[in-house]
Amino acid sequence: SSFDAALERGCQVMALCTGGELRQRAERKGQPVWVFQHTGQPRTAIPYSFGMLLALVCRLGLARVEESELQETFSVLREGREQLSAAAELSVNPAKRLAGQLLNRNVVIFAAGELEVIARRWKTQINELAKAWAVFEGLPESNHNTLAGLEFPESLLERTSALFLRSGLDHPRNALRLTATQQAFMMAGTGVDAVHARGQSRLAQMWSLLQFGDYVSYYLALDYGVDPTPVDALTRLKASLAAVK
């Protein structure tokens, strides 16, 4: 396992987990353990995994987050929760509207810099909640290859929606690349939409986009008429792998 490999290489190790085998291994080896209680799907544990990792790197002096950044992030998320909740009508709920636009379409999510990990989150949430196809692309890398594939098959392009996660904190060159890539996809006949981060700090902006993507994925699942909670395909895969020792 990665835990054992890290110990063999002499790394300092700390376990963050809900218990189980990892906790037992860490305690047997005398390594520190942070245990948190979570019983839902792994994808819903991101506040724990992110918050605990952030606390760890800050305590180690590897990062610094101002209290004002945290408070702004909490405020932005509370506002987003009200705006995007199921109680909010379609006319004033952008997550519901975007989900409707993605119905029966292939989805590709673009982002640059630190927001690339948020694009990955959008992709995996659409996969797991809506049981729908989605991919993500990071810039500038995708400008070296993806744009060359905007010719065929035309029937696929017509049923593709390209989403661009944007931030006022994007590097100027990345912002230029995002705009140019949006235009290229539009000219190719795909659906194009941009989602802009809210807040002033990078932390608030990242979490605002993550929150928005989670709501979009949830509403897309409802539009498809599927239960967003189970991931039967992954359960079957794990079972088949576990059967082979």
Go through the PLM ranges and name each one:
Residues 40, 58-160, 244-245:
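Active-site phosphate/pyrophosphate-binding segments
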Residues 56-66, 130-131, 217-230:
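Short helix-capping/linker segments at secondary-structure and domain boundaries
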Residues 12-14, 32-34, 106-108, 132-135, ...:
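Structural motif
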Residues 227-245:
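Short, small/acidic-rich helices and loops at N termini and domain boundaries
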Residues 45-52, 122, 177, 208, ...:
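Catalytic-loop motifs flanking and including active-site residues across diverse enzymes
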Residues 1-80, 100, 167-172, 179-191:
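Glycine-rich phosphate-binding loops that contact phosphosugars or nucleotide phosphates
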Residues 148-232:
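C-terminal active-site/capping subdomain that shapes the small-molecule cofactor and substrate pocket
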